[in-house]
């Protein structure tokens, strides 16, 4: 099998035990040899001018394809690469990653080309999460290379699309290799051109142990050009190490997550008010059409973007009535029944950080007695499980407590009986929550048995879902599906959990007051 086939198969080894043993075998003369190679054959002393030499144009702030302090001073502080995250924090993240590797190791992080909706129509671009975490760079088709040069240091290289006046006229500004160091704090910047790709290839080949640590394989066009440099190179995943670093959030990240949660929470408040107003209007007028799920979905999306969010965290669930029985219902195209509940699971992404909230509220603005009984049961589980979000617990241990509480409520309501306690799974089929961060389902390599530590963020989302066709349930509860979800920061010992989504109303009295416009 040729090497490029090996690359495309990307045979992953998650063994980390070889790192320490490999480190002890690195010799000083190897470092000297590599240093000479870097300075000569790679020509790393090349640098680019950032000055505008076109005398025929008026001078203007340099646009690099994303917000900078120079072009967006109202968004970014002087030392920030992205909103809320300074250049130093990005450097610290790279340092944390490289501490896991022996001298001479090479880590390479790829971000793929822009995904296309059709032949020449692109999807809205979202940067690869790990690439964003390590660089803050927001263009497709880029390669980050990190080379461990000593026990305490590494060198960083960023290869990007070159600037192209004609293409930028159509698709917007690019950074170009010449601006990488200034704006992103990367040691060396290069363009992904035929001239510079051999430099990338030699960097990858320079690994002293014959291993490359990657997040994924390069895209096909780049892969073909790198093939001559990759003979006898083995590829290992760096995904778990990156996720381990991402699992615990910095103070700056928690602030960004709080902002994301507050934007989404406030938008839930406004969406409840909108739903109450529209539903009241349509119910009192024979000429008005009933509210549709897609109208509620669209209004929420407008609210979060109006407050500065870049996008939704995921396709929202806006499920009226029995649609709430489908956990990931995303068609959002059914008319809302005035007497039904509306289960809405939605969040936003604010500068790379996500929120994930579920609220359930009555289309009419007023809970029925049966709806209130089930809702209070779910809310009770939500609150008690939030109290358990402390160091030493696990998502699994909190889930077991949620099962115990759900079982008790379902028995009390007459939905399950003592002889079949495991029937709770029919009405509560999912886990209590998941890790949350830059991705909605964050750090997926880590199971729910990991001991929670300060700075981790998880969701707490108990639910009870009853089909309107379930004849085993008292009739008054049929068709009631309720979930209440919040985002919670694990605090330091002896402190209370921080609920990032505290602005999303969840008490019955508060919801009814908002929806009646009181």
From Swiss-Prot:
Binds 2 manganese ions per subunit. Substrate binds at residues 314, 345, 356, 434, 441, 461, 485. Keywords: Aminopeptidase, Cytoplasm, Hydrolase, Manganese, Metal-binding, Metalloprotease, Mitochondrion, Protease, Transit peptide. GO terms for molecular function: aminopeptidase activity; manganese ion binding; metalloaminopeptidase activity. This is Xaa-Pro aminopeptidase 3. Disulfide bonds: none annotated. GO terms for cellular component: mitochondrion. Its EC number is 3.4.11.9. Its main location: mitochondrion. Catalyzes the removal of a penultimate prolyl residue from the N-termini of peptides, such as Leu-Pro-Ala. Also shows low activity towards peptides with Ala or Ser at the P1 position. It is found in: Mitochondrion; Cytoplasm. It comes from the Eukaryota. Mn(2+) 2 binds at residues 345, 356, 485. Homodimer. The lineage of its organism: Eukaryota, Amoebozoa, Evosea, Eumycetozoa, Dictyostelia. InterPro entries: Aminopep_P_N, Creatin/AminoP/Spt16_N, Creatinase/aminopeptidase-like, Pept_M24, X-Pro_dipept-like. CDD domains: Prolidase (cd01087). Its cofactor is Mn(2+).
């Amino acid at each position: 099998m040729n090497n490029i086939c090996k690359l495309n198969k990307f045979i992953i080894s998650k063994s980390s035990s070889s790192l320490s043993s490999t480190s002890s075998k690195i010799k000083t003369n190897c470092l000297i040899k590599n240093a000479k190679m870097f300075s000569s054959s790679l020509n790393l002393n090349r640098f680019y001018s950032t000055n505008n030499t076109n005398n025929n144009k008026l001078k203007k702030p340099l646009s690099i394809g994303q917000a900078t302090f120079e072009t967006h001073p109202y968004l970014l502080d002087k030392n920030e690469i992205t909103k809320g995250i300074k250049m130093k924090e990005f450097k610290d993240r790279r340092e944390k990653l490289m501490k896991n590797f022996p001298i001479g190791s090479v880590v390479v992080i790829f971000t793929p080309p822009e995904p296309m909706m059709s032949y020449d129509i692109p999807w809205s671009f979202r940067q690869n999460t790990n690439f964003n975490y390590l660089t803050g760079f927001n263009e497709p088709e880029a390669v980050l290379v990190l080379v461990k040069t000593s026990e305490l240091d590494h060198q960083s290289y960023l290869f990007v699309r070159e600037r192209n006046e004609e293409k930028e006229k159509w698709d917007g500004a690019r950074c170009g290799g010449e601006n990488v160091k200034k704006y992103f704090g990367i040691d060396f910047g290069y363009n992904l051109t035929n001239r510079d790709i051999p430099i990338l290839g030699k960097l990858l080949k320079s690994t002293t142990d014959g291993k490359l640590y990657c997040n994924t394989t390069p895209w096909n066009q780049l892969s073909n050009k790198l093939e001559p440099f990759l003979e006898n190179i083995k590829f290992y995943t760096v995904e778990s190490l990156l996720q381990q670093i991402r699992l615990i959030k910095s103070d700056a990240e928690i602030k960004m997550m709080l902002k994301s949660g507050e934007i989404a929470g406030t938008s839930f408040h406004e969406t409840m008010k909108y739903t109450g107003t529209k539903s009241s209007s349509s119910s009192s007028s024979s000429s008005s059409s009933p509210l549709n799920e897609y109208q509620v979905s669209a209004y929420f999306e407008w609210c979060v973007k109006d407050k500065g969010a870049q996008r939704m965290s995921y396709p929202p669930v806006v499920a009226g009535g029995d649609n709430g029985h489908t956990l990931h219902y995303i068609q959002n195209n059914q008319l809302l029944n005035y007497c039904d509940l509306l289960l809405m699971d939605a969040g936003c992404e604010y500068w790379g950080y996500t929120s994930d909230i579920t609220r359930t509220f009555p289309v009419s603005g007023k809970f029925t007695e049966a709806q209130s009984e089930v809702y209070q049961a779910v809310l009770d589980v939500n609150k008690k499980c939030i109290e358990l979000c402390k160091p030493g617990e696990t998502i699994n241990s909190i889930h077991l407590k949620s099962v115990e509480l759900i079982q008790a409520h379902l028995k009390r309501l007459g939905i399950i009986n003592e002889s079949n306690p495991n029937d709770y799974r029919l009405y509560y089929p999912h886990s209590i929550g998941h890790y949350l961060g830059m991705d909605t389902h964050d750090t997926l390599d880590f199971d729910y048995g990991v001991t929670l530590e300060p700075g981790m963020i998880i969701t707490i989302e108990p639910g009870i879902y009853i089909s309107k066709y379930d004849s085993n349930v008292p009739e008054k509860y049929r068709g009631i599906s309720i979930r209440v979800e919040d985002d919670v920061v694990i605090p330091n010992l002896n402190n209370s959990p921080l609920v990032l989504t505290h602005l999303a109303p969840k008490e019955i009295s508060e919801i009814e007051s908002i929806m009646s416009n009181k």
